[in-house]
């Protein structure tokens, strides 16, 4: 496998033939470039010719997809991890609220309005993911506040609401910490991070299919494995098992189905901290057959700590890296 260094100092391992080019590297049919520097970059939203980027800090950034520096588009948040756009508006999911903006020319944001306040305290799992479903509702994740414990209220759930913040509904529960979901047709798939401190190889990270109102096992199960402290406790409902297991501790976060990949998905694996030999730190291609995931293979490696993946209008792959404070674009 060839090793190449970009000008930005990030290393890429080509999975096929690799040819160096002046402004980046070619990975088979793709070319890797640094699109912009964004501090602690997290979820991304492609909104016309602007890429909005949530962060772990206090600001949301706007990046011109045609090239140029990122600029601070809005501030005054507490960890505005989640961003999504619909009908000319941007929605920002932070620790304690959902905020809506009107998107103006050049990606300016106007008319700031909190549409939902008082979100549950999710402790160390307070990085909300947000997306607009095929039904035009907003879907938001609410992590559990712990490694393994009984969540309360909306902790450990995924919920949906109207775009004005009304009609909040719990659509999934028993979810430890989902920081990524997307739709394949009308079917929603979501990642979920497995528990820590149970060993190098258990429990797995999960990929699940949303069944409205379904129970996904936490804190009783991680995959099909009983979790520490709840081995003999009777679960409150029948568990909906994962449709695919990722390796334990890879920290599977953002997932996106790509038109340019024939309906396959890319998944950002943020990387382990609770394992003797580190795993993850890559983007994998999740291949589907007959509507079901069958394998996950490395697509991009050594791209820092990838958080989210999105498809630009031209089919390019966008990757956010919160550790390196960067957005990368992989052009065909």
What positions do the PLM features span?
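A short loop-to-beta-strand structural motif that recurs across blades of beta-propeller domains
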Residues: 59-61, 97-99, 157-159, 206, ...
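Beta-propeller domain segments
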Residues: 127, 145-147, 161-164, 176-177, ...
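Blade-edge beta-strand/turn elements of extracellular beta-propeller
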Residues: 29-37, 67-76, 103-121, 151-180, ...
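Beta-rich catalytic cores
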Residues: 40, 76-79, 126, 154, ...
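Residue position within the beta-strands of beta-propeller blades
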Residues: 53-54, 92, 139-141, 189-192, ...
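Residue-level detector of Asp-centered blade-edge/turn motifs that repeat once per structural unit
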Residues: 46-49, 85-87, 132-135, 182-185, ...
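Beta-strand-rich domains and repeat architectures in extracellular enzymes and scaffolds
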Residues: 35-58, 250-257, 267
């Amino acid at each position: 496998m060839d090793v190449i260094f970009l000008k930005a100092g990030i290393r890429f391992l080509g999975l096929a033939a690799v040819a160096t080019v002046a402004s980046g590297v070619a990975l088979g049919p793709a070319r890797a470039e640094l699109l912009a520097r964004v501090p602690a970059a997290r979820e991304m939203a492609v909104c016309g010719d602007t890429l909005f980027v949530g962060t772990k800090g206090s600001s949301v950034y706007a990046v011109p997809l045609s090239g140029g520096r990122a600029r601070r588009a809005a501030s005054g948040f507490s960890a505005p991890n989640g961003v999504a756009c619909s009908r000319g508006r941007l929605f920002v999911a932070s620790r304690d609220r959902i905020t809506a903006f009107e998107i103006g020319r050049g990606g300016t944001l106007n008319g700031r309005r909190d549409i939902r306040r008082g979100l549950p305290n999710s402790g160390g799992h307070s990085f909300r993911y947000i997306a607009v479903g095929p039904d035009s509702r907003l879907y938001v994740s609410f992590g559990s506040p712990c490694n393994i414990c009984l969540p309360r209220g909306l902790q450990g759930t995924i919920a949906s609401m109207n775009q004005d913040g009304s009609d909040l509904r719990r659509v999934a529960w028993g979810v430890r910490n989902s920081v990524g979901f997307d739709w394949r047709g009308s079917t929603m798939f979501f990642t979920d991070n497995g528990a820590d401190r149970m060993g190098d190889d258990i429990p797995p990270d999960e990929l699940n299919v949303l069944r409205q109102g379904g129970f996904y096992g936490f804190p009783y199960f991680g995959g099909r494995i009983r979790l520490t402290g709840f081995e003999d406790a009777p679960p409150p409902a029948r568990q909906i098992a994962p449709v695919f297991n990722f390796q334990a501790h890879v920290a599977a976060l953002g997932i996106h189905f790509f038109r340019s990949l024939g309906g396959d998905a890319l998944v950002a694996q943020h990387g382990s901290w609770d394992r003797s030999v580190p795993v993850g730190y890559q983007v994998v291609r999740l291949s589907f057959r007959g509507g079901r995931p069958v394998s996950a293979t490395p697509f991009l490696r050594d791209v820092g700590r990838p958080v989210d993946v999105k498809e630009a209008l031209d089919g390019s792959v966008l990757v956010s890296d919160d550790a390196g404070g960067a957005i990368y674009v992989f052009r065909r």
